[in-house]
């Protein structure tokens, strides 16, 4: 064999097309392993790949003068996005899942044990098992491309890194930094990864391979003495304090609802204190146990559900291209919509407001958001400037003739929204879609009188727009399928998860939220303290309690939705009459510093910035005293939400249980570890759900009467998802 000529061999003993790994030996005797999973858009690791990787190593060893190996992806924007999660659904026991982890550990140990240097040349997503593979290499170099991210997100699936990640990462970047990355599952961009020591170099994509070659020439990585910081953290006393602090902080955030976080801390500690081999054993065992937990099953269900949703347009039509976007209103919502359109969608945005102040507000808001990214080194100042040039404004309709879609974000006033349609039909192109960002007004009423009703659609964003991931797309009876598909496509370009919902009062998210908040209000009127109610629901798994949420949304905004809901859907949506006193007292929530809580403008490190406003109690004529079991508080509020979600499915407000689960989790923070209302009801069982509602109905009234859908499902012993392989059946 001529060592000076490049040649290619494949990892598979069959054909190149069946192998995800192929080996090319360069003239300089450096081997390049290309990763390219056949027929897949991104690279993911599968159990059968262990044999393929080992075959590559065997072929490499046959080349006597080989200087080293470089792993690189043949996919455009994906190094390795993680393991193929469907493998876990095939595991019927913890032992089977544990064996998968052991296989990964053994395979990556083979990489670390190779007698020559190995480099991971990373471009695109390097996540989960992909990063664990890279950690087993001697060196890591990544591209500076914005699509390059590194992380161990397994905790977001209720798992821990099972192929050595819990053992290798702390030894590479330090115990505290590793715990932070593994426990949060957050992603690092190239610059962050370089600063943390996760990669050795971060370079432009076009010199990635050349840089990997130069690094490889250094030879096998030699052991480097620990720095003073690592030595300090590894001292028994400091280490004990660190683990104690991390455990306390983690439990305060998770309230014990996520078993993976406890296991992560235990496994990392075991490896640090008892050695790597012992750490591996505990890592694999913990991984196997976590795979079988209901929490992981629920989180994997959401993973599959969101992936399935991305593959649908929401309508039986193709989306038309969107080149320019118009926005009516430069307030908080309008400014937020402009931000995600320009920053994530990379689309030119034209804002119209009745005065310059509104436009200036939107521009200032976007500048502040981008400046935060510049200050955190996630964006260069030149990129901030470029994105700001995409946003312009005017007090008239100049430029709107070029808009393909106009998003209205004005006050919740029916006459005003109808006027906006008329003006857009006068000034915009005949093909321009009119999307109303309304939280309560029926779209068919807004579209009444429109000359082109087929182009009118609802597009409900949640506040704050730059942070909340969900949007509801609401067609009315005359909205065209193309309009729906195009609106969904725009929402996805903006980085949103979009569900298509029916045009009825409250749509889906606000409709299931209202009875949940109402029940919290009834608990308050029974004398339960505000903080007790909120804490009960936070412990259950919601990010904030219902009364704190009311303050955040705005008490005035929330109460405007109530008449719309109660008029169309009945008395169960009527808020307690005593609550009128809260509005009359001028309480709007955080926006005016006065709601169920008092908000201090100046925060101190010993103070959260808000405290219960006890002057609420006399307004409601109650004396606060904690007397309701927290489990009963959460049961009452959550059961109201579950019952309403089932009604929404029965009435066609949502198209399927999958959309209902996604809407609740991403729209209002329904506990992800429960998988959404429908997944949770399946887990409880229809018998338990109906029985609980009947008991609550007997105690608290007919608002708890189980809906017809639940009664029918109990009768037929049915579930919302197919019992077999439920986590992968989300249609």
From Swiss-Prot:
Positions of the UniProt region annotated as 3-hydroxyacyl-CoA dehydrogenase: 320-729
Gene Ontology, cellular component aspect: cytoplasm
Keywords from the named record: Cytoplasm, Fatty acid metabolism, Isomerase, Lipid degradation, Lipid metabolism, Lyase, Multifunctional enzyme, NAD, Oxidoreductase
Residue span of region Enoyl-CoA hydratase: 15-204
UniProt site (Important for catalytic activity): 132, 154
Gene Ontology biological process terms from the UniProt entry: fatty acid beta-oxidation
Name listed for the protein in its UniProt record: Fatty acid oxidation complex subunit alpha
Native source species: Pectobacterium atrosepticum (strain SCRI 1043 / ATCC BAA-672) (Erwinia carotovora subsp. atroseptica)
Gene responsible for this protein: fadJ
């Amino acid at each position: 064999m001529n060592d000076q000529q490049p040649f290619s061999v494949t990892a598979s003993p069959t054909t190149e097309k069946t192998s995800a790994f192929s080996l090319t030996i360069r003239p300089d005797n450096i081997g390049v392993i290309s990763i390219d999973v056949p027929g897949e858009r991104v690279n993911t690791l599968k159990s059968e790949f262990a044999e393929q990787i080992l075959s590559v190593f065997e072929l490499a060893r046959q080349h006597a003068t080989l200087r080293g190996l470089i792993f690189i992806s043949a996919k455009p924007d994906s190094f390795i996005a993680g393991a193929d999660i469907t493998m876990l659904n095939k595991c019927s026991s913890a032992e089977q899942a544990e064996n998968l982890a052991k296989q990964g550990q053994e395979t990556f140990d083979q990489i670390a044990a190779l007698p020559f240097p190995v480099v991971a040349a990373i471009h695109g997503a390097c996540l989960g098992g992909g990063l664990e593979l890279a950690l087993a290499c001697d060196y890591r170099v990544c591209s500076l491309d914005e699509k390059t991210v590194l992380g161990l997100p397994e905790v977001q699936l209720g798992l821990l890194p099972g192929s050595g990640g819990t053992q290798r990462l702390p030894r590479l970047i330090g115990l505290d930094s590793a715990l932070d990355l593994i426990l949060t599952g957050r992603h690092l961009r190239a610059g962050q990864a370089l600063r943390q020591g996760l990669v050795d170099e971060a370079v432009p994509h076009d010199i990635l391979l050349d840089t990997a070659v130069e690094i490889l020439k250094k030879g096998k990585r030699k052991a480097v003495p620990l720095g003073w910081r690592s030595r300090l953290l590894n001292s028994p006393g400091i280490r004990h304090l660190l683990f104690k602090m991390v455990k306390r902080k983690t439990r305060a955030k998770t309230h014990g609802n996520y078993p993976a976080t406890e296991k992560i801390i235990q496994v990392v500690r075991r490896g640090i204190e008892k050695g790597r081999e012992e750490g591996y054993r505990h890592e694999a065992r913990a991984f196997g146990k976590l795979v079988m937990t209901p929490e992981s099953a629920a989180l994997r269900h959401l993973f599959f559900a969101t992936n399935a949703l991305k593959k649908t347009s929401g309508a039986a039509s193709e989306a038309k291209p969107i080149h320019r976007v118009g926005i009516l209103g430069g307030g908080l919502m309008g400014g937020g919509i402009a931000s995600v359109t320009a920053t994530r969608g990379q689309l030119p945005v034209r804002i119209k407001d009745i005065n310059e102040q509104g436009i200036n507000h939107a521009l200032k808001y976007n500048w502040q958001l981008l400046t935060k990214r510049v200050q955190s080194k996630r964006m260069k100042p030149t990129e901030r400037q470029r994105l700001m040039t995409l946003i312009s404004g005017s007090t008239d309709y100049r430029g709107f003739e070029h808009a393909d879609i106009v998003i209205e974000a004005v006050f919740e006033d029916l006459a005003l929204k109808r006027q906006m349609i008329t003006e857009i039909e006068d000034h915009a192109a005949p093909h321009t879609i009119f999307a109303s960002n309304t939280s309560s007004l029926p779209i068919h009423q807004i579209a009444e009188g429109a000359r082109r009703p087929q182009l009118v659609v609802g597009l409900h964003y949640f506040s704050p727009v730059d942070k909340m991931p969900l949007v509801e797309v609401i067609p009315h009876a005359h909205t065209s399928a193309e309009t729906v598909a195009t609106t969904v496509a725009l929402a996805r370009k903006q980085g949103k998860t979009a569900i298509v919902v029916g045009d009825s009062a409250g749509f889906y998210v606000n409709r299931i939220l209202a009875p949940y908040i109402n029940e919290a209000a009834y608990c308050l009127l029974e004398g339960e303290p505000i903080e007790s109610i909120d804490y009960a629901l936070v412990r259950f798994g919601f990010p904030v309690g219902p009364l704190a949420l009311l303050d955040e949304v705005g008490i005035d905004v929330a109460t405007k939705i109530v008449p719309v809901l109660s008029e169309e859907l009945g008395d169960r949506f009527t808020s307690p009459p005593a609550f009128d006193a809260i509005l009359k007292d001028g309480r709007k929530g955080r926006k005016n510093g006065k709601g169920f809580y008092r908000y201090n403008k100046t925060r101190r490190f010993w103070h959260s910035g808000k405290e219960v406003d006890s002057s609420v109690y006399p307004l409601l004529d109650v004396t606060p005293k904690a007397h309701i079991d927290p489990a009963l508080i959460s049961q009452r509020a959550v059961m109201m939400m579950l019952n309403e979600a089932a009604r929404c499915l029965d009435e066609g407000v949502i198209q399927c249980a999958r959309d209902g689960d996604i809407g609740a989790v991403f729209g209002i923070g329904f506990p992800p570890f429960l998988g959404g209302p429908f997944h949770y009801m399946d887990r409880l069982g229809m018998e338990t759900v109906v029985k609980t509602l009947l008991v609550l109905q007997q105690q608290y009234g007919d608002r708890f009467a189980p809906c017809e859908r639940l009664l029918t499902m109990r009768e037929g012993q049915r579930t919302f998802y197919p019992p077999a392989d439920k986590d992968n059946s989300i249609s």
